[in-house]
């Protein structure tokens, strides 16, 4: 109680001081003084709280004394102030200074903690300690121990452990007195526990009996009320169910009667309708016989007229197919001629020529009239518009193969003109000069040296019949491209080996693509003209 009141008063003083100083500082607006006062106030609150908490928690007191600057001195001064000459010896002694006070009183300075500070007789002869004070913890064997009593036993054991940890050395008489007091305390605790358990058992028994009686009375009352309620509810539900069942059966009976009535009426109507239909059929049969006789007599030439119309329709279909085939062939010849003209003309763009639209047009025309597919292989030797099963195989003709290969070669790709191929070949002039100066197995240094010295070479022009060096080959290819002899130029370039062939690989692909497209267009043009 004294510690708690002291801490409360100290906290109130600190808070009141902080509030007063804060109001004054805000009014005067002195930032330096305000900072100093706040720092001092914070340090005061910190140390005051640490000292106050050290009185209640031994672990925190040890940490505060060891690691906080001036913590040990403040705690010591507080204990001297609180437990000094003005207090009675033995009252309110903290566990922290218990060992020191016992040693001072018994062995060293008996006047240091004297309550009155008066003169006392000093014992000249000090009895040396004979053995260490040892105590056992209080043990109460009861599983149903009250929580509050268990907390009390734990607090007593904690105090005993603290006294044991002080390692106090006393005489036999002092130890005997302490052990006697300890035995009395243990007996009192055991007796209190026994009385507490007996009282608790008695109270539990009385309350249990009272609760059981109350529950029995309440159960009987609830059972009677519930029985009456369920009986009334059952009678009411039974009456409601009986009324609903009677109403349901009455409705079902009325529904069945109406259904039977409708069935009989429908059956009667069906019989009347059947009789009418039979009469109509007989009348129709008579009329048909009359019409057949009249047609055989007056319309005998109708079948011959129908056969003539059918023959005329077949002739018209054949003529239509022939005209459509002729138109498709004409458009395909015109389209292939325009493709040839585009390939021979100079390119209008640097990227090349795209033939996707023309190829799609050729595929569409070939699908209108079956020109590109052959007749089937079946034994019946069907025509080109075979309608046999899927198992009927078809052998591809040159027309179908040509269209497919043209689609693969030119679809999604650009075709270069002769002028564009010639310009791209001229762009390889520097690489050819460097390649002509390369050794057998050139490295990075060899390529660099050849590139530097190639700037000093002159470009050879014209055709050299016997020339086999790279400059002669370059000049021959240039001349063939200029004269539109792309096949010979491509053959000379393909015959190159090593690094020159690698340099010309892109040009070779473009030239091959152009020659393939031209050859396929020529093949398709020949096939279309032969139809």
Curated annotation (Swiss-Prot):
Function noted in UniProt: Component of the MICOS complex, a large protein complex of the mitochondrial inner membrane that plays crucial roles in the maintenance of crista junctions, inner membrane architecture, and formation of contact sites to the outer membrane. Plays a role in keeping cristae membranes connected to the inner boundary membrane. Also promotes protein import via the mitochondrial intermembrane space assembly (MIA) pathway.
Ranges of the Mitochondrial intermembrane topological domain: 54-531
GO cellular component: MICOS complex; mitochondrial crista; mitochondrial crista junction
Family: Belongs to the MICOS complex subunit Mic60 family.
Cellular localization per UniProt: Mitochondrion inner membrane
Stored PANTHER family: MICOS COMPLEX SUBUNIT MIC60, MITOFILIN
Subunit structure: Component of the mitochondrial contact site and cristae organizing system (MICOS) complex.
Coiled-coil positions: 210-267
Transit peptide extent on chain: 1-15
Classification via InterPro entries: MIC60
Membrane topology type: Single-pass membrane protein
Alphabetical keyword list: Coiled coil, Membrane, Mitochondrion, Mitochondrion inner membrane, Transit peptide, Transmembrane, Transmembrane helix
Topology feature Mitochondrial matrix, residues: 16-34
Domain of life of the source: Eukaryota
A GO BP annotation: protein import into mitochondrial intermembrane space
Protein name: MICOS complex subunit MIC60
Transmembrane segments: 35-53
